[in-house]
Structures are given as C-alpha cells and as structure tokens.
C-alpha cells in the first residue's frame, strides 16, 4: 500500500502549472455544485412550502424526479443523452456547453444536490416555531422581511446537520465525474 502511495502521490497533488490536480478538480466540483445547488434550493424550498399548488407542484415534481433516479443515470443523461438532441446540436451555446464533460458533471451534481437540499430546507422552514412567525406578524413584518429576518435564519440553523450530511454525500458523488471523462481524483 505504501508503495502505491509513494508512486502516485505526486500525480494527485503536484501540478506543472498547466493542469489542475485531481484534488483541485474534485474540490472545485464539490464547491461549485454545493454553492449553486444551495442557492437554488433556498428559493425552491420557499416555493415548496407555498400554499399555491401551481408553484408547489413543479418543485415537488423536480425533487421527486431527481431524488428518485440515481446520480449516475442523471450524469449519463446530461453527458450522453442531451447531446443527441437536435436542438442542442443546432444551438451554438448549448452545443458548446453539453460537449464538455466538466459542464455536464457540474450540472448533474448541482441539480441533484439542489433537489435533496430543497427538501431539507423545506422541512426546516416547516419546523420553524409558529410563535416566531406569529411574533414577526405582530411586529408588522412583510412576508419578504419575515422570511429574510426570521424564518430563513432559524430554518438554516435547523437544517445545518442534515445539510452537512448532504455536502459529505456530494463529496462522495464527485467520484462519478470520472465516467464523464473529467480527470478528478481518479485520473
């Protein structure tokens, strides 16, 4: 085992200045997908707890599909399947985007973590004590100010343990980037 580590450690950590190391690409995949997915998830979670069914149903369907299919299948759909569509080949921007394995991997990881994080944040918003919401209404807070100052800070504290587990699972999931020809830690 030590022989293997001594032989390959330089290729994992050292760079010649032109290429990123496998560790750097893995961390970049993790950070970019978690940040983009987390930002999207906050807005989707607010819509998910909405009483309006026209807002709530599409978000539920999105989370149902992305949580119900394996990440490997999602990655293959974005990497191999999307490029076979004529609209993707015909549009220059989409063609350039879906031709890159790195872009497809970031998109699949972002949407996957967004679906899981949306449900985590929606559950946290639902579990904010009713007394806090009632107090905000008594002070005359608007809905936007109530979400910004009372509900979201409290919900994010509630969601932190489950969200940290999601970040760890996303770190594990970055290993699938190798299937889309992204030279990550497994290069």
Could you describe each region identified by the protein language model?
Residues 1-187:
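Transmembrane alpha-helices and adjacent helix-loop boundaries
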């Amino acid at each position: 085992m030590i022989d293997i580590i001594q032989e390959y450690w330089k290729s994992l950590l050292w760079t010649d200045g032109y290429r990123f190391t496998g560790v750097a690409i893995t961390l970049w995949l993790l950070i970019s997908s978690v940040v983009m997915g987390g930002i999207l998830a906050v807005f989707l979670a607010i819509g998910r707890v909405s009483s309006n069914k026209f807002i709530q149903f599409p978000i539920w369907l999105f989370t149902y599909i992305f949580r119900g299919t394996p990440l490997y299948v999602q990655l293959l759909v974005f990497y191999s399947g999307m490029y076979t569509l004529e609209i993707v080949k015909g549009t220059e921007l989409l063609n350039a985007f879906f031709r890159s394995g790195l872009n497809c991997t970031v998109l699949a990881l972002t949407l996957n973590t967004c679906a899981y994080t949306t449900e985590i944040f929606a559950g946290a918003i639902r579990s904010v004590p009713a007394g806090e919401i009632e107090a905000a209404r008594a002070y005359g807070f608007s809905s936007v100010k109530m979400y910004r100052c009372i509900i979201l800070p409290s919900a994010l504290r509630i969601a932190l343990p489950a969200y940290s587990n999601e970040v760890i699972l996303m770190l594990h999931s970055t290993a699938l980037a190798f299937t889309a020809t992204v030279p990550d830690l497994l290069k």
